[in-house]
A protein has these predicted regions:
Chain C
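Catalytic histidine-centered segment of alpha/beta-hydrolase-like enzymes
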Residues: 348-361
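Conserved loop-alpha-helix segment in the C-terminal half of the alpha/beta-hydrolase fold
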Residues: 313-348
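Flexible "cap/lid" loop of the alpha/beta hydrolase fold
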Residues: 213-217, 224-255
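Active-site loop/oxyanion-hole signature of alpha/beta-hydrolase fold enzymes
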Residues: 118, 162-203, 207, 362
Length: 324, 338, 373
């Protein structure tokens, strides 16, 4: 498997990011229960290999556009975890000054064009970023994260067509976690997702989203294709979704057995640990050390978010326009 | 100074700005004139000929015909704006913004606020609006109140060739998303337009005509009818100010209030439907902030609360005209408190 | 036309005027009118101004009443001596050929401004009249040829009169990058060559006065006379409020406030006038060009060019100043050498050629005649 040719540093980085996402989401879930997080969140736990497997190929000048379930993409693209946590707590130190919340975390300086509250929101934006790269003659690519819900949106269909006719350097990363809110994708998605790309003459791949290395390899090919000017790729990435649609979702549309099996059999983190230790690329002690560091970082992020000030009331009316 | 058509004024603005800034691009349906066909290049230059000649001057990378998928290309324009370009997207009819409204009011309009002030979205969306061409309900609306309602958007409605050019250049140079609406009946109207580039600032009403008896507020094509009404009334000894706000967001409240206070009578003409329209909005501002100066109730002359009809007699009855405006002014002037 | 009976007609102020509104009669029927007496107020889209009677006599009949609009050239009233009978007045009105106005007929052969290439410069020039020693009219900072709306026609009765837009003003391109008065003067001299002007009467207002002085400094042989109206360049004081305010104003309200400083009585200003100045200032390149000129004209609120020594009495010079000038004080006309004629006009601000047009026209006409004689 080619992913195993990654350097130790890259492997450690991938593991750290995946672990960071998992711990971040588990902690947000716990903090939600405490009642101190004012808004709603949609947790990415279980899907970490997808975000990290793709974003590891990207530099800061590459762009991604994300979904309502965006924390994982943000962390994988390099957003500041303290700022993200503060944002979710609605604080002035938040990455969006407390104005966006979980669903609108963005950091343009990191090439993160925003989580998005609208299903199917990302594909047109990612096409736009790719258009910028193409017109300005840059080598940057962009990634539209969407899901088995978003694949049915008109925006996604329109964007895939536009990307293909204009040969835009964009990757449509369709994270299929099996559910659009509470409705199973098997109930609402007709046909095969990859066939939608095939019909447009677009390159595609279907990958196991629990396997970091599989995602990383498929994404690598897609990114290289885009950088070569050969246009877009659709990646159909099958992942689990550990939590319900939103934090606090009783998730009673799935059986307890199904959920337990999912967490037992489809977890990207132990699978990654097993693979790298069996191949003797990293030691368990190194991985455990990362776990401890990540835990400390998240503890710190929560502590600083809790103690941070609320936004000033005067900021209610600022930053609507550059100039009005 | 040279006389130019409204269409030519817009075309010059696009030429100026594409020359001035390589980040300016134009995209939309048939803006490059109809690509991929066997006949002449740049045959259409946009559905209304506004983008004619851009393809030849700036090439197919910066002047792009799109699929008929407004969500994709307006959304892409928003994404491109956020990442460094200055896209000018053309939507043939403002009515079609219905199929990509999410891209405008959930995405482009809100990037800056949602992202804590870090995003800049210099996007222009040009579209035609207005009744009078027998185009019926889905190609004739005056939807600017809808966009005016959305924080984060700027909304521009030029009434003259001079304003069309200066406001479009301002829109392209502006760092916020701008909805730029062109009344299709005005494309062949002619007026003085400088050859060089210039800007007309947003939020600055134009005093088209000065008179002490009443203020007629009008936008876009209605400015012409308001002038016509003012001429009719002048012959009767009623002197009207005609005020063209030029942009509904930002709105030049200061000048509206100043003129309302100076004349004490206000008639607002709006081609849009009456409920939650610009006439209603402006009248509420004046009623709230200049009530003491009013000598008569604020009069509204608007389209009825109906879709735009097709039959010529019905359409003519739908659109406000000089006669209805003059009648409203006379009524205001004749008003006596009992 | 007999001197016993004379027509008062709608004046034509500038090329674009086709009609005017009779805003008010300043004398009633039966009043005796002296030549030069203010007789009526006329309003156009651009400006409102009083009109002085050219002739004298009794105001026998008002033909166009207050509030009515009439085309350029239309008969507005009749002046006649006492001995003219009412029936003769009626006959005069009935037969007045131009009663309907001449604007429509004149539209085609009206003089048109042209763009004149002069070296690297492209000047807008409007020329009227012919013969004599030509006069060149040079407007002030931020102005244009429209400054001379009430003057060019009268001055062109017996000579060619060229109204020019300075570089970066009106319809002339911003070809003087430095903004230095001396460079502007050199550009105007290049225009002289392009127009085949050997020698001219220079009539300059404000900054245009300084430009005229700068031309006289380097090329006295090209200057028949100087008529300087509230000129810059002969004293230190200048209103920084005006210059800075003019540079800063981007919108109607602040621009209106700034422009009102120009006039003793700003009532004659209207929205169109303010709009036209804003239109000029919005052109790409103009704000920078104006700032460059201002930067060479003044520093720390004082004028920094001193051309006062040019007024040494060798070149015939007339200085006209409004007593109520709020931009450059009229006191700067004190203490000039003998041989420099000074006229200070009460009731005028920085724009006497507009506010007291007839008086300024008389002064300049007399001065030019004297300078040629």
């Amino acid at each position: 498997m080619t992913g195993l040719q990654l350097s130790r540093e890259e492997l450690l980085k991938a593991y750290r990011l995946m672990r960071m996402i998992r711990v971040f989401e588990d902690r947000v879930s716990a903090e939600m229960a405490s009642g101190d997080i004012p808004g709603n969140t949609h947790l990415y736990a279980g899907q970490e290999a997808s975000a990290v497997g793709i974003c590891l190929h990207l530099s800061e000048s590459d762009r991604i556009a994300s979904t309502h379930r965006g924390h994982g993409h943000c962390i994988a693209k390099g957003c500041d975890v303290d700022g993200m946590m503060a944002e979710i707590f609605g604080k002035d130190t938040g990455i969006c000054r407390g104005k966006g919340g979980s669903m609108h975390i963005a950091d343009l300086s990191k090439g993160m064009l925003g989580a998005n509250g609208i299903v199917g929101g990302a594909p047109p934006i990612a096409c736009g970023a790719a258009l910028t790269s193409q017109i300005l003659g840059r080598n940057d690519v962009s990634v539209a994260f969407t899901g088995d819900g978003g694949i049915n949106q008109g925006t996604t269909a329109e964007s895939m067509n536009l990307a293909q006719v204009w040969k835009l350097p964009v990757i449509f990363a369709v994270e299929d976690n099996g559910f659009g809110e509470a409705t199973a994708s098997s109930f609402v998605v007709a046909g095969e997702i990859t066939k939608r790309a095939e019909a447009l003459g677009m390159a595609f791949a279907k990958v196991d989203g629990v396997d970091f290395f599989a995602v990383h390899e498929a994404a690598g090919e897609a990114v290289e294709r885009a950088r070569r000017g050969e246009g877009p790729t659709l990646l159909h990435i099958e992942t689990p979704r550990y939590y319900g649609h939103f934090s606090g979702d009783p998730d009673n549309y799935r059986t307890a057995e199904e959920k337990a099996a999912m967490r037992r059999d489809r977890d990207c983190l132990p699978r990654f640990r097993r693979r790298v230790t069996e191949a003797k690329l990293l030691g368990l002690d190194e991985l455990d050390k990362v776990d401890a560091e990540v835990q400390a970082a998240i503890d710190q992020a929560v502590a600083s978010a809790r103690s941070a000030p609320q936004p000033a009331l005067s900021s209610l009316t600022t930053d609507v326009y550059v100039r009005y | 100074m040279a006389q130019k058509s409204f269409r030519q004024a817009l075309n010059e603005a696009l030429h100026h700005e594409m020359r001035r800034d390589p980040n300016v691009i134009v995209l939309g349906e048939d803006v490059a004139g109809g690509s991929g066909a066997s006949g002449q290049k740049d045959a259409w230059g946009g559905a209304f000929g506004v983008t004619k000649g851009l393809l030849g001057a700036f090439g197919p990378s910066r002047v792009r015909d799109t699929p008929i998928t407004e969500s994709a290309f307006v959304g892409a324009a928003a994404g491109a704006a956020m990442t460094g370009l200055r896209p000018v997207a053309e939507i043939m009819f403002v009515d079609f913004l219905g199929v990509c409204f999410d891209q405008i009011f959930n995405q482009a309009a809100k990037f800056r606020y949602m992202f804590g002030g870090k995003a800049v979205t210099p996007l222009v969306i040009r579209a035609t609006y207005g009744a009078g061409t027998r185009s019926a309900s889905q190609h004739s609306q005056a939807l600017y109140p809808i966009f005016t309602h959305v924080p984060g958007l700027k909304v521009v409605i030029p009434s003259s060739p001079y304003d069309a050019k200066g406001l479009l250049i301002q829109a392209i140079r502006d760092n916020d998303p701008v909805i730029f609406l062109e009344n299709k009946v005005l494309y062949d109207t002619v007026g003085e337009v400088p050859d060089g580039a210039y800007t007309v600032p947003f939020g600055e009403a134009h005093i088209v005509r000065e008179g002490g008896d009443a203020t007629i507020v009008a936008l876009g094509r209605m400015v012409h009818f308001a002038r016509e009404a003012a001429e009719i009334l002048a012959a009767e000894g009623i002197d009207c100010t005609v005020l063209d706000p030029r942009t509904t967001s930002p709105l030049d409240e200061d000048t509206l209030l100043e003129m309302a206070e100076e004349t004490g009578r206000v008639v607002i003409v709006d081609e849009a439907n009456p409920r939650c329209g610009m006439a209603a909005d402006i009248s509420s501002i004046i009623a709230e902030k200049a009530f003491g100066a009013l000598k008569a109730p604020i009069m509204k002359v608007t389209a009825p609360h109906t879709p735009v009809p097709y039959a010529p007699n019905l359409e003519a009855a739908y659109i406000p005209d000089a006669k209805r405006i003059a009648d409203a002014v006379r009524k205001a002037v004749a008003f006596k408190r009992s | 036309m007999s001197d016993r009976i004379q027509a008062i007609t709608m004046p034509k102020w500038g090329m674009t005027m086709t009609e005017g509104k009779l805003a008010g009669w300043l004398a009633g029927e039966g009043a005796d009118i002296a030549a030069g007496q203010e007789i009526m107020e006329v309003e156009t889209e651009k400006i409102t101004n009083v009109v002085e009677s050219q002739g004298q006599g009794r105001l026998r009949r008002i033909v166009v009443s207050e509030g009515a609009t009439a085309p350029v050239g239309a008969l507005l009233a009749v002046l006649a001596t006492e001995d003219v009978s009412d029936s003769d007045v009626e006959a005069f009105i009935a037969s007045y050929a131009d009663r309907a106005g001449s604007a429509a007929a004149d539209a085609d052969d009206a003089p048109k401004a042209r763009i004149v290439q002069a070296g690297a410069h492209r000047f807008k020039v409007l020329s009227l009249g012919s013969g004599g020693v030509p006069a060149v009219l040079i407007h002030g900072f931020g102005g244009d040829g429209g400054t001379w709306l009430f003057n060019q026609d009268t001055l062109a009765q017996n000579r060619a009169v060229h109204v020019i837009d300075l570089p970066a003003h009106g319809d002339s391109e911003p070809t003087v990058a430095s903004g230095k008065v001396t460079d502007i003067a050199d550009a105007v001299l290049e225009l002289f060559a392009a127009l085949d002007i050997e020698k001219a009467h220079l009539i300059g207002h404000s900054l245009g006065g300084a430009v005229a002085l700068a031309i006289a400094e380097t090329s006295p042989q090209r200057v028949q006379s100087l008529s300087l109206i509230a000129p810059a360049g002969i004293g230190a004081e200048i209103s920084a409020n005006y210059i800075d305010g003019f540079l800063a104003a981007e919108r109607r309200k602040p621009m209106k406030d700034v422009l009102s400083l120009l006039f003793a009585d700003p009532q004659g200003m209207n929205a169109e006038m303010v709009e036209n100045v804003l239109r000029f200032k919005r052109l790409d390149g103009v704000p920078e060009a104006l700032a460059a000129i201002a930067g060479h004209l003044m520093a720390d609120g004082k004028q920094i060019i001193d051309l006062r020594a040019i007024l040494d009495g060798k070149i015939p010079a007339l200085i006209v100043w409004g007593e109520a000038d709020q931009i450059i004080p009229a006191s700067q006309s004190d203490g000039l050498p003998a041989g420099v004629d000074v006229a200070r006009l009460a009731g005028a601000g920085h724009m006497p050629m507009m506010e007291e047009a007839a008086q300024v026209n008389r002064l300049i006409t007399a001065h030019l005649g004297k300078a040629e004689g």
